[in-house]
Amino acid sequence: MAERLTGKPVADAIKEELKGRVADLKAKGIVPKLGIVRVGARPDDLYYEGGAKKTCESIGMDYEVFEYPQDIDQESFEKAIIEIGAKKDIHGILMFSPLPKHLNERKIRSLIPVEKDVDSLTLGSAGKVFADDPTGFPPCTPTAVMEILKYYNIPLEGKRAVVLGRSLVVGKPAAILLLRENATVTICHSRTKNLPDVCREADILVAAVGRAKMVKEDYVKPGMVVIDVGINEDPDNPGKYCGDVDFDKVEPIVDKITPVPGGVGSVTTAVLCKHTVKACEILNGLV
């Protein structure tokens, strides 16, 4: 049976480190603060928001929720985002997406100040991540993947990493972050030929396609590390969730694997707070 790379100890270690950094900031009269922007009240957004609030509270960080009705118009929402971005006491901004279809999301994202964009919503942040600029913040989910690999001392240099999925939110930034650690990276997608064969070449497989239990036993090999980013409704167990990996079939074969739930997702709010604390330090000229 594979070793389960659970997220809780990773998140706990991040939060423990952040408590000290927040205390240092408070000693200077600075309180890091996250602004959470939400339109409507989707259950998934409310669930993540609850986790973010809890994490902020656990490390002594502040937060403020900016909630808007589902039918808010473009002009009003743009004005609201500009006002939030200008607040000196807000150091990081999380905006839930997708926004309602009548809103121009690309335009609204562009109004978030890059230095407060702690989940890589803007093109400016994406550019910084691509250019390895240390002041840029990658999306929280692929950063959580890297935090897990680091915590469990999984070597990356010279290793073959396959990223299954090419989204701007996970796949592409995950590939960039793996490249930073000198892994040799392949990105796979729906048009990749002989997909299971390509995935089997990996030492580390990152599954981020958003398809329940897509990764079967023919995608993996003994000795592999599997990081499952997916969170999907389980087709075999109504009301429950599963990842992109068919856990029961893959776990007996591979060396290490993240569970769903309890894996990558449980680390993302800790990363969100870590990014916000760093943004606060940068904005106050402390790094």
From Swiss-Prot:
Entries under SUPFAM superfamilies matching the protein: Aminoacid dehydrogenase-like, N-terminal domain, NAD(P)-binding Rossmann-fold domains
Its EC number(s): 1.5.1.5, 3.5.4.9
Catalytic activity: (6R)-5,10-methylene-5,6,7,8-tetrahydrofolate + NADP(+) = (6R)-5,10-methenyltetrahydrofolate + NADPH; (6R)-5,10-methenyltetrahydrofolate + H2O = (6R)-10-formyltetrahydrofolate + H(+)
Keywords, alphabetical: Amino-acid biosynthesis, Histidine biosynthesis, Hydrolase, Methionine biosynthesis, Multifunctional enzyme, NADP, One-carbon metabolism, Oxidoreductase, Purine biosynthesis
Pathway it works in: One-carbon metabolism; tetrahydrofolate interconversion
Assembly mode: Homodimer.
Record protein name field: Bifunctional protein FolD
Protein's organism: Carboxydothermus hydrogenoformans (strain ATCC BAA-161 / DSM 6008 / Z-2901)
Gene: folD
